[in-house]
Amino acid sequence: MDGVTENNRVSAVQRYLDFNLERQKDLEEIVMLASVICNSPIALISLMDFDIQIIKAKIGTEANVMPRSTSFCTHAVEMDEIMVVKDATKDERFATAPVVINDPHIRFYASANLKSYDGYNVGTLCVYDTTPKDLTQQQLECLAALANQVSHIMELDRSLNQLKKQNCVLREVARIESHELRQPVASIMGVMMLMKEIPYTQNPEYLELLDKSVNQLDERIRMIVSHVNDYPE
């Protein structure tokens, strides 16, 4: 992977790091399913940052962060297909990795990539085992389907976070604009009150129409601000 592509990929990763904790349970359920379907004791959902692997959900391990330099998933995000390592001790890429030669003595690995909306491999849904093995075609398809589900969940969360930020900006704009609009309206309403105290015999219906229009405008401004404030934060 060239430097420009990797920088773009890492930029895509940054969009998903602040994951909504309300959906953490969804991710935990998916890693549990991956573990059961693939009959593997360890399963992870992780994002691949520039030099670290950030674990967002897990089963069978206590790790939260791992260096990318010795990570199986570093190789996985560089390809588009599912990656399978049947026996890590026989694969020169991983035979000397710390997790292979030391506890937990990983032997098997399989992963499906998590994709951003613009097509970058931002992370993986992966499973590990301490004994060499392979997966059936059905297991591989299920792993890919679960990874797609993770991608959809994370993209939904990113979109909702973006919408909340836009709503905050919109509320602030509405607050400022309502002040700017209501100030002259309030002045006009004040003048109207003074005019009502003065006998006005020529075309009084014009005064009533103007008074009604100003009050309607004031009410409309209040409604707009109230509607904007109802948007989710």
Predicted segments, located by residue:
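Interdomain signal-transducing alpha-helical coiled-coil linkers
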Residues: G3-E6, T136-L143, H152-V169
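Intrinsically disordered, low-complexity terminal regulatory regions
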Residues: M1-V65
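A short, aliphatic-rich beta-strand micro-motif
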Residues: R107-D118
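Regulatory sensory and allosteric helical modules in signal-transduction proteins
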Residues: Q53-K56, A63-R107
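Regulatory loop-to-helix N-cap segments in sensory/regulatory domains
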Residues: V65, Y128-A145
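Residue-level recognition of the "H+4" position in the DHp/HisKA helix
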Residues: I176, E180-Q183
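Conserved C-terminal segment of the DHp
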Residues: G190-T201, K212, D230
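Conserved DHp (HisKA) dimerization/phosphotransfer helix of two-component histidine kinases, i.e.
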Residues: E208-E233
